């Protein structure tokens, strides 16, 4: 006890944080602490600064430096260590005699701090000896002590003094304390371990480490011990000065004899307390080791009698000084044997140990090793939390360190810490003891045997001898390393780690221990020599013991000690970088101690860069090779091969062959890692290549490092191996990175190259194994990455047999990285794999700089092109139907005399046509979709297709895109369920309820588990956890129990007739049956409340998922809307979590989990239908939709039978496409083809299969058109044509046009069908079958025929043809007339095409006006509105069209323009408008422009107002447009010849004029007319005559056709196109020309000619529509000559007119959509939505705004102002023939047109 206490007092790590000197008893009490605590204590000891009391803090750095030098001294340091050891044994006796040694007690420590300065010298020696002795017996404690001593030698001395001062009587007691404290150490040092040999030595260290860990005070003291290195510093615990002297004395003894080191420890423990001080003083250069020796002494002496004996031996040795140690290894061996025999630790044979020590001392390399070791130890101290003790391993590892030399013992602790712990044996056995401290904790038992072992000396010699270093993988010393290997044959190179018996191997033993806690200490020791600074950053890895052992074994075998000089005490911090230390090629092992590698770092790096370099490159290459990326470039031993093979290329410091040989194992790890980023290095060339290819992925090694973190043990194992090289990896800059500290960085280097996170695990593992060398190579580029990489990859052969070593560490490491494998394994890896597609290696590009050839420039001016397009460039054009035309230029070389290189002549290449499906194959389902679904015969094919799709969804799983959704799995299942329900719907002809088979089918789909038990009494909700088993938490039976008092109160309430009180009394008493019976006779609200209360208190409180049952009860009670609150409470929907304070139930689960009960709720509702349950399902669907559960929501909508199918722009639409979320993801609707096809199947099942003649989802027609385009692009033109025909048939069959049947849709269908006819072989058949299609879509020929004949051929176009048909016949003769009729008709393309040429010509003439018109509106949409303007100027549809049409109609319109009908038709109206506009350019432009602006406005304002504005404008324009023929003919009256002039007066004009005329009197019209006449005098005259004639005729015709017109007007109100056409008829007959213009603005269908209700109002001076009173107010068209003035007013009126919706409808008839527009107009506000959702805009667009747009742009605002009167005239302004005629004349302007107008005037006059 006393001895242990003394040791604790001597060892700052054991001292209490308060620095009070603990009593021996206290120390003993602390000793029982677990190894983890010991480790912690060591960790604390490692950090000198933390403790104020710790002497280390006070100790100046000089002392620390002084401590390190002993390592460099071969004989003297060893002797010092021996002296310390000897002295420690003496203190052991002394401790036994002197209880005061109990310094561990905090209070004692405080006293000691005060007393130590006085007594440190006297008692310090004794204590030192005792502590050393104790340390030896207490192998576990010894490591800590050694570390503490290294860091706190002075403190220890002081502490001893204080201890002695405070407790002189406990001098004898120390034995027991040591026995207690150092029992472990005693076992390690005292008995079996110390005599055992190197392994014993490490065991001793291990034992010592444990004691240190045990006492918390010791831990704090250990931290203090770190400062002990500075004698000058005095810690509160004990005076530093005295202790320093004691330590010096102790070191002196150690210097005298290597073997006497331990003797001195013992002796000093008993008698020569002053010696330890003296030794410590002498070894001020290596105070760390001395301090460790001192701490070792006390633990050993206390540990056991054997330890005492050993202390005695050490005391003798101490008296003999360290020289004695070096002089007599036999004595040391004897001491060790005695100690080991007493100690439990595995003792290394004394003979072995002595021989090893002797060899170590004899070796010239000892000094080098000492230096390295000294550097390594300090580095380790810095590197590890408990490294301080390791840094001073002389005490802990003094057994081996002493025999070797002062430097050697230090090296041993280092090697012990880094390498031996990494061995699997050590790692397995020692990890628990707190490897964090380092070797001290991990190898206390081993340390005891090691001190006697000369393995350290061998390590030194090995350090010098890279060859020998290879031999000893366990310790830095060569001898130790080799014997270690021999002993640990099972480990090829890591044998040291496996065999702990030998002294050198003992070092390996500690590493395993350290691997668990501190892999860095051992590794750190080796790499510390090379890269001490890097190690500190990697203190994290200090906990990993394996790295330290590896450095030892590796340094000993390779030139690890060679870097010894470099491995000054600073090296210790690098231990974390031991792998980084790899840079020193020879010292792969020494890479652990960066010292060895530092010298070679630069060289290794250079070697890596230049594999040819034999020597320096060899070492780095060895490191590289050892690193998982040992390049095949370097051979095993030879310097030249070493760069390539990268096996331990000897560092410049050591012989090349030995290092190469040794380094082959370790060098591969560090050397390659650090050195071979540029140059491939691997154990094998293949491995190297793999590494090289993957080197760019070093960054990825971090992941590998993370992986290695999981296998911290493997890292340690690797460290045991030559990992030391990995431990110290050299960065290209020559800096050693401490891979060990990094955790497993070195291991990653060897274990695996950077991993590709995307690579398959199998491949990654194999690749990492094969590419491990590569891991090392990349580090040179970046040391940290290399380190990380090292961590992941198995250790490439650190030694000759890297695989064995790697395996050994793996075995020792609990967590084995699959990548960690022998270097041979990695080397064998095939480069191919390394370059696997998953490999992270950067893609290799086999590219050669293209030769720059000179082009021959052209001489025709193209050479001036700044883009130099004359050089030629590939041209690719995507055409219709999936056709692709490509043309690549030809570069023809031209050779000329005297020119070495040819010049290139660019010439066009061959144009080739390809099919898109050949370039981009389109995956089609096994069963082709049978669409379009036209009849019941498709049912079977549809079911087969649905089944195939369902199977596909089930087999393919969740798509990558769907996985982005947080609930992708549930949504996938719900999608499959939706498809299955649609299949059932198709199977049962659109029925989902009623019959038992349907219920059974639904049950099998919604609740598959019930299908097996169809007779189950449970409903759909059965999947809910058996409700029958659910019972209220408060026992429902009790709640229903009869309470006499409650029943009495209930009866009393009922006697009084107060049923309400009776109900609530029953509720309060939980008499639910009574409450419900009474509530059933009361108001419904009471019943609902009672049920709600019942659900809340009984159902919701029950265990299990009762949400669906609660919802069902709510539905039964009539709480339909509130039923969903049972699934997701309102608070949860608001984002809050409510907790009930009544029932005391907290939120047992997520409130949103109730959404998952939707299926149960649906099943319960379907099996228990109630009157309003469909509303509940609708609410449930909306709830699900709000949370993004689209498929589930649509299922509920389908069963609710109340869902609204509509366009995306319809806010009331519940479903646009089944399975598509139009609310949250509207942009995806058009991209999901499956959603459209599924919706088409639903439409087919609910309409055709249900008995309806046609499909009834109007909004789906637009999607069908899109699908047809998609099919055409795929080359499936026949199917696309079928869809076009189906759309046409649907449009034709409907008697009530929908807003979705807009003109965009019509034009789109016509455009697509026209293209398909032109590009398909069966076009003839298409033409034959086209008539109906043409009527619907506006086929050119069909429209022309209808226009000429006046038939209502355009049924689908809603009678637009009618409006112009009357006029059509007559106007068909005129070029302008056909255009007008065409324009009026939704289908006008045919006619328009005929008139298109003239109109286009006029368009050019009137470009200004036309241009202006489009500018007012959207370029695409506006043109249509213009025509519409004339056709249906006031129709909101037009506005709607503009909005909705933008996306849809615009493109089709453009396309249609290209189509002859479209083009002809569109230009016509715009041209006339333009001419009208031109005639009234100035004034009309402004007003009309507003009108145009209005059309854009329509979407927001509504179609009605827009139509009016447009109507006015459009009517003026369309009036112009309808007049356009007239205008085309000339601004003079001649335009009427086209009937366009006349058309404006038609009913179409009436509608618009109503709005516009209402806003503005006829003045506007006269102004326009005047303007137009002013523009053209002839036109003015003609206009005047025409005005009179038209007025007269209009009055007559209006009267005659009033009745007919009224009927037609009513029809037109529904179908605007019809009215417009009717206006054409009146225009044709005479006074009705204005109506014709109106018709031109409106659909052709309206045949208002015969029934023209227009009459000429003399007061208004315009034609007035009798049926439309508002038209009388609109006088815009009255004065044709003042067109300029009139148009502005009209425009203004049009602007004001927008409000009227009625007028829009009249124009609407021109385009079928108008009627539908009535509803859509609000939607028109949104142009895009209108495509699908707002049909009205499409309708407006039907006039083909595109062509109009083309024409419109030319139109000027002023000219457009002219046209507005015409639109007004066409509907409302039509009453004024003059207005009608005037605008056309103005537009026509041309003489030819004038002639035509004249003809027309004549007709009108007649």
UniProtKB/Swiss-Prot annotation:
Residues 489-501, 610-627, 793-805, 830-844, 1686-1696, 1747-1761 have a biased composition (Low complexity). InterPro entries: Sec16_CCD (IPR024340), Sec16_N (IPR024468), Sec16_Sec23-bd (IPR024298). Residues 340-352, 360-374 have a biased composition (Acidic residues). Its main location: endoplasmic reticulum. Residues 461-470, 1591-1613 have a biased composition (Basic and acidic residues). CDD domains: ACE1-Sec16-like. One of its GO terms (cellular component) is endoplasmic reticulum membrane. Residues 502-524, 571-587, 638-658, 1697-1710 have a biased composition (Pro residues). Residues 23-45, 73-91, 128-154, 165-194, 283-304, 412-426, 662-671, 737-753, 1456-1465, 1503-1521, 1528-1540, 1547-1559 have a biased composition (Polar residues). Residues 1-202, 263-305, 318-846, 1418-1647, 1663-1806 are annotated as: Disordered. Keywords: Autophagy, Endoplasmic reticulum, ER-Golgi transport, Membrane, Protein transport, Transport. It is found in: Endoplasmic reticulum membrane. One of its GO terms (biological process) is autophagy. Belongs to the SEC16 family. Involved in the initiation of assembly of the COPII coat required for the formation of transport vesicles from the endoplasmic reticulum (ER) and the selection of cargo molecules. Also involved in autophagy. This is COPII coat assembly protein sec16. It comes from Aspergillus terreus (strain NIH 2624 / FGSC A1156).
